[in-house]
Regions:
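Conserved N-terminal Rossmann-fold NAD(P) cofactor-binding segment
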Residues: 1-14, 55
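Residues at the C-termini of beta-strands that transition into short coil/loop
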Residues: 8, 48, 75, 104, ...
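N-terminal Rossmann-like NAD(P) cofactor-binding module of classical short-chain dehydrogenase/reductase
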Residues: 16-19
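Rossmann-like NAD(P)(H) cofactor-binding subdomain of soluble oxidoreductases
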Residues: 24-85
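Substrate/ligand-engaging "lid" and interaction regions
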Residues: 78-176
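Small-residue-rich helix-loop
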Residues: 177-204
């Protein structure tokens, strides 16, 4: 670890690749804050992407960065982690298969090669439409949380999000998956079902 800092300018200057590792609702705020310090040739990676390229493209152009930086989306965060105590987290597992693409995709060959040097587990997909329509958090998170929301948030001292999934949540996830696969197929995107995707990611 070379440096830890809360100074945005100091964090991004002289960096080849900048990772946005934060919830999607904060992508725009943080990118806007960093934008004044970004320089020619830098690569910004949103992980997890959640359509970040489409959501941020107007801001990228407004800041005059569309010809200056490369924006890349990763389908999912590299680590399966959780809080285990005050100011303490633990990485329980990591992904072995993570779709990634530049936005626009014409930069895929050159720029995705750079991020694959950092995470060889990144697999370059055709474009960000394909990465976003591949299984990931949207395939299961809401489907697991909604049927058990009261239990998770009001009653449970501890809830193992994936291993304690309910039958109702499984049915919702499968139904969502059927719709997602249809949409992906319509746009000629390479995809698979969410269970096969989980096997690829974690090699269970």
């Amino acid at each position: 670890l070379n440096k830890m800092t809360s100074n945005a300018k100091e964090a991004v200057e002289d960096s080849d690749v900048i990772f946005l590792t934060l919830p999607a609702q904060h992508h725009k705020t943080v990118f806007n804050f960093l934008s004044d310090y970004l320089s020619q040739g830098q690569t910004v990676v949103a992980t997890t992407g959640y359509w970040a390229g489409f959501r941020l493209i107007d801001l990228i152009k407004e800041k005059g960065l569309d010809k200056k930086i490369t924006f890349i989306e990763a389908n999912i965060f590299p680590y399966l982690s959780g809080k285990i105590g005050p100011a303490k987290a633990h990485i329980f597992n990591y992904k072995r298969f993570m779709p990634v693409s530049a936005f626009p995709s014409e930069n895929n060959e050159e720029k995705c090669k750079i991020v694959r040097e950092i995470y060889p587990e990144y697999k370059v997909f055709k474009h960000v439409l394909e990465t976003n329509l591949y299984p990931g958090n949207p395939s299961v998170h809401a489907q697991i949380a909604l049927p058990a929301a009261e239990f998770i948030f009001e009653k449970a001292r501890e809830f193992k999000f994936y291993s304690e999934v309910t039958h109702t949540a499984s049915k919702l996830a499968d139904a969502f998956d059927e719709e997602r696969i249809k949409v992906a197929s319509y746009f000629d995107c390479d995809t698979t079902d969410h269970l096969t995707s989980a096997e690829r990611m974690y090699e269970y």
